[in-house]
Amino acid sequence: MTEIETIGFHYVVEAAGCDPEVLGNADRIRQIFLEAAKVGNMEVKASYFFKFSPTGVSGVVIVAESHISVHTWPEKGYAALDVYTCGTKANPEKAVDYILEQFKAKYAHVSEIKRGIEEDDETFTHMIMTWEEALRKNGNGSG
């Protein structure tokens, strides 16, 4: 079977059962994302995070390879996470795994989108693979 060439990988993650204290802390999420970029072998260019009142955070880290972004709902223990990278140097899956661990997520619904698949007629398409994971039981880190 031939490997499909792609311009980038986009991970769209629904993280549930997360620690509300982490999800409500913009500074902590910034630290997590900056470290996730390192773990995923990405070069950070800029970051911006905003804390909503009374709760929730939205933020983005721009990396040379593309971006890592999040929107959180601490009251629901939920975070919507995107990690998109171009090229072959970065490892977005490692970044996603690190973020889920730091958010103390119990469950994740993950879609990996292979983007920029070139077709014969100079157009591009994408391919999606989706899975769900139970990450933690009873908050003790065992899966």
Curated annotation (Swiss-Prot):
The active site is at residues 66, 71, 86. One of its GO terms (cellular component) is cytosol. One of its GO terms (biological process) is spermidine biosynthetic process. Its cofactor is pyruvate. Its EC number is 4.1.1.50. Gene3D superfamilies: 3.30.160.750, S-adenosylmethionine decarboxylase domain. GO terms for molecular function: adenosylmethionine decarboxylase activity. Pathway: Amine and polyamine biosynthesis; S-adenosylmethioninamine biosynthesis; S-adenosylmethioninamine from S-adenosyl-L-methionine: step 1/1. It catalyses: S-adenosyl-L-methionine + H(+) = S-adenosyl 3-(methylsulfanyl)propylamine + CO2. It comes from the Archaea. Is synthesized initially as an inactive proenzyme. Formation of the active enzyme involves a self-maturation process in which the active site pyruvoyl group is generated from an internal serine residue via an autocatalytic post-translational modification. Two non-identical subunits are generated from the proenzyme in this reaction, and the pyruvate is formed at the N-terminus of the alpha chain, which is derived from the carboxyl end of the proenzyme. Keywords: Autocatalytic cleavage, Decarboxylase, Lyase, Polyamine biosynthesis, Pyruvate, S-adenosyl-L-methionine, Schiff base, Spermidine biosynthesis, Zymogen. Binds 1 pyruvoyl group covalently per subunit. The keyword Lyase applies. The record marks 65-66 as: Cleavage (non-hydrolytic). Catalyzes the decarboxylation of S-adenosylmethionine to S-adenosylmethioninamine (dcAdoMet), the propylamine donor required for the synthesis of the polyamines spermine and spermidine from the diamine putrescine. Heterotetramer of two alpha and two beta chains arranged as a dimer of alpha/beta heterodimers. Belongs to the prokaryotic AdoMetDC family. Type 1 subfamily. This is S-adenosylmethionine decarboxylase proenzyme.
